[in-house]
């Protein structure tokens, strides 16, 4: 085969030799395209699988861990929560509206294909410098396009987007991150899996017709960007949320029957990945008649049909004899449905075109036994250069505070979350903007389901292992602050070019941090995604392992607020402040540095803090609780006051005034109802605590900082809109 064609398919010399060994001959173009997609980083996880294998994935409440379309946990009274987070970074950078919209569509399908109705969405967004003279305007365009795409798709689907995070840093100038999370619920007995078994069982294509959009998407998402990447725009899929809504309702109707064996979303690599994954999981073979595929465009080829990433499509393995009943359901909802193949016992994928065999590929070497790479790793040299950094506050705490409050990483993101419908389905208890975790009521069992998503990329740059562990601890802490017990996580691991040994070292360390934290905190990994090649012109993003956590309280009425109210009688700090300025926002703003060292996570102290929060909430001692994050105590208090429309008069006992900005983990601000009961309770449980102060009607006073509540709110609520223009 022509070497240029092989190169265009991102197949290495070693991989091509392996293809020859597997097939026993030269591949044709169709076979090369299929193998290229299945062996892409996006589909095969060939660089990352080695490090993912040790993740803790089991617990009594885990029903389904990694390996399916989404993870599943038991949330009580025979109900399950189905959830996953994944990336759509590369398409969103090329075409922000369409890329973000189809990212939402893809994650929704991953959840409802398991048999669950989607009840909540979240997102984690990272953009570059919006103030830069050269690229600031483009970054603002990306922000607006991505947010518009997410809101368009989610709102049209009738799925509440209830939370998320949005951060900005120069490391994302050339590669933005768009990570989408979805959660659904169903009865445990009604969960469906992606399998294709039973010789002769029909394979049915359902959903929208196949077009040429998204061709080569999986391969594109497995490569770095450069100046010519704008030409990749045709590889970004086009989404139709109204078609997806019909598809979801049709699938949920189908799931009430006994007509099917398994079902799989057509995501990256389209018909290729769905067919190979279903057959591969089941140890089966499959025969596909590609000319039977519903087509949107004329003259489409087998290559295009196998690799198109047109949206809103599913592949079903039905029980023989029930195929017409399946088709009838989808036709009723105005969707295409066609029998395009059947299950075999050959262990091979047989591809036919108008009766002619045009492709014959063994399934296992492309699915369950795809190549795994052992890439070289090297500790980055920059770590030695940054570790000795020490932060010194050289301006007044008042000035530092106002700079932090006005920073785009702190200021309120109402511009974003007000575009999302957070109350549709009428289950939302805490949505975006309410600080901390987001919560919904599950009407079927009246439980509180809380979820949070986060990644502090600066911490992961300073120490990839501790930074990843800190993300796991932080989302769990937010869940506990909402009154729910953290149960499990889903991860989306965003890193740079795996061909760079320093990036692979960061990735390996990040995985170690997640393994350690999940094991110690008893929050297993149930689903996830890896996004590599987040690099442009040789510049990689900071390591960014996004972690989403889900937790439960059996009583929905036990939801705990994240900011003060008139019922707050006193304000307390829980946890120990250790002067951790490594990777802090204050260091980035004042010294223009992402440097220093991180404190190890004290997992026993973390668990003790979670336990206290849950028990104190159960005892009705707390009015509110909020995990301390970027900007430290000062910014956490400021947000709680701004949201509550209440001031405070507070004082710390720190010898170093700058400690109000440090970012030590395992700390929480609580507003207490009954101070006497609180002190008794906190002493009994052995939690480190210190009184900060009380509410104030008009001013925000913290040590040397004094600002009117009105001015604080103006800065906090208005700055982000000013920046976007």
From Swiss-Prot:
EC number(s) stated in the UniProt entry for this protein: 6.3.5.3
Which residues does the record give as ATP binding sites?
45, 84, 491, 528
Cite the GO molecular-function annotations of the record. ATP binding; magnesium ion binding; phosphoribosylformylglycinamidine synthase activity
The record ties this protein, via Pfam families, to: AIRS (PF00586), AIRS_C (PF02769), FGAR-AT_linker (PF18072)
Keyword Protein transport listed? no
Stored Gene3D superfamilies: PurM-like C-terminal domain (3.90.650.10), PurM-like, N-terminal domain (3.30.1330.10)
Q: Name one GO biological process term.
A: 'de novo' IMP biosynthetic process
Q: Does the keyword Magnesium apply?
A: yes
Assembly, per entry: Monomer. Part of the FGAM synthase complex composed of 1 PurL, 1 PurQ and 2 PurS subunits.
Q: What function is annotated for this protein?
A: Part of the phosphoribosylformylglycinamidine synthase complex involved in the purines biosynthetic pathway. Catalyzes the ATP-dependent conversion of formylglycinamide ribonucleotide (FGAR) and glutamine to yield formylglycinamidine ribonucleotide (FGAM) and glutamate. The FGAM synthase complex is composed of three subunits. PurQ produces an ammonia molecule by converting glutamine to glutamate. PurL transfers the ammonia molecule to FGAR to form FGAM in an ATP-dependent manner.
What's this protein's name?
Answer: Phosphoribosylformylglycinamidine synthase subunit PurL
Tell me which species this is from.
Campylobacter lari (strain RM2100 / D67 / ATCC BAA-1060)
């Amino acid at each position: 085969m022509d070497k240029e064609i092989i190169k265009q398919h991102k197949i290495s010399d070693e991989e091509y030799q392996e293809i020859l060994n597997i097939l026993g001959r030269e591949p044709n173009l169709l076979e090369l395209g299929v193998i290229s997609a299945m062996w892409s980083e996006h589909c095969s996880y060939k660089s990352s699988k080695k490090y993912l294998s040790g993740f803790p994935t089991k617990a009594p409440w885990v029903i389904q861990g990694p390996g399916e379309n989404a993870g599943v946990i038991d949330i009580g009274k025979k109900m399950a929560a189905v959830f996953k987070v994944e990336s759509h970074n590369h398409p969103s950078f090329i075409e922000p509206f369409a890329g973000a919209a189809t990212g939402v569509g893809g994650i929704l399908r991953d959840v409802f294909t398991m048999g669950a109705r989607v009840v909540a969405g979240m997102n984690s967004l990272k953009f570059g410098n919006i103030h830069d003279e050269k690229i600031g305007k483009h970054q603002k365009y990306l922000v607006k396009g991505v947010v518009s795409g997410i809101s368009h798709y989610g709102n049209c689907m009738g799925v509440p987007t209830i939370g998320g995070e949005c951060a900005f840093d120069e490391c994302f100038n050339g590669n933005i991150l768009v990570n989408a999370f979805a959660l659904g619920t169903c009865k445990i007995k009604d969960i469906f899996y992606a399998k294709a078994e039973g010789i002769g069982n029909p394979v049915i294509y359902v959903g929208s017709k196949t077009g040429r959009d998204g061709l080569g998407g999986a391969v594109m998402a497995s490569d770095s960007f450069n100046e010519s990447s704008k030409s990749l725009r045709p590889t970004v899929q086009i989404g139709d949320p109204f078609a997806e809504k019909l598809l979801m309702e049709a699938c949920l109707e189908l799931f009430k029957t006994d007509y099917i064996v398994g079902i799989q979303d057509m995501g990256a690599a389209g018909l290729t990945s769905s067919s190979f994954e279903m057959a591969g999981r089941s140890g089966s073979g499959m025969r596909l008649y590609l000319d039977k595929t519903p087509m949107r465009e004329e003259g489409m080829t087998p290559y295009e049909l196998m690799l198109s990433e047109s949206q809103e499509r599913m592949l079903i393995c039905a029980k023989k004899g029930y195929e017409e009943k399946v088709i009838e359901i989808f036709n009723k909802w105005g969707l295409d449905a066609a029998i395009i193949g059947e299950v075999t016992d050959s262990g091979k994928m047989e591809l036919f075109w108008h009766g002619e065999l045009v492709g014959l590929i063994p399934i296992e070497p492309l699915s369950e036994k795809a190549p795994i790479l052992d890439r070289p790793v090297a500790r980055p040299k920059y770590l030695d250069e940054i570790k000795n950094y020490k932060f010194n506050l050289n301006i007044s705490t008042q000035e530092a505070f106002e700079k932090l409050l006005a920073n785009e990483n702190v200021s309120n993101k109402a511009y974003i979350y007000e575009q999302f419908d957070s109350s549709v389905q009428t289950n939302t208890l805490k949505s975006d903007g309410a600080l901390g975790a987001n919560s919904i009521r599950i009407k079927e069992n009246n439980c509180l389901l809380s979820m949070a998503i986060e990644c502090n990329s600066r911490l992961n740059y300073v120490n990839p292992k501790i930074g990843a562990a800190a993300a796991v601890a932080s989302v769990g802490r937010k869940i506990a602050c909402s009154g729910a017990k953290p149960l499990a996580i889903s991860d989306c691991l965003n890193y740079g070019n795996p061909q760079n040994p320093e990036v692979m070292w960061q990735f390996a360390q990040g995985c170690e941090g997640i393994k350690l934290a999940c094991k110690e905190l008893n929050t297993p990994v149930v689903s996830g995604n890896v996004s590599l090649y987040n690099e442009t012109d040789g510049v990689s993003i900071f390591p960014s392992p996004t972690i989403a956590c889900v937790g439960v309280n059996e009583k929905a009425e036990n939801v705990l607020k994240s900011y003060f109210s008139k019922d707050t009688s006193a304000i307390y700090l829980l946890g120990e402040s250790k002067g951790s300025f490594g990777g802090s926002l204050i260091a980035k703003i004042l010294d223009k540095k992402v440097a220093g060292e991180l404190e190890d996570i004290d997992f026993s102290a973390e668990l003790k803090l979670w336990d206290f929060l849950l028990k104190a909430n159960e005892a009705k001692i707390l009015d509110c609780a909020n995990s301390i994050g970027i900007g430290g105590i000062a910014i956490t208090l400021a947000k709680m006051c701004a949201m509550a429309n209440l001031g405070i008069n507070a004082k710390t006992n720190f010898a170093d005034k700058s400690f109000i900005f440090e970012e030590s983990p395992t700390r929480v601000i609580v507003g207490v109802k009954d101070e006497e009961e609180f002190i008794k309770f906190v002493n009994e449980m052995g939690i480190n605590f210190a009184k900060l102060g009380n509410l104030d009607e008009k001013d925000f006073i913290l040590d040397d900082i004094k600002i009117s509540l009105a001015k604080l709110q103006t800065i906090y609520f208005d700055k982000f809109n000013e920046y976007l223009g």
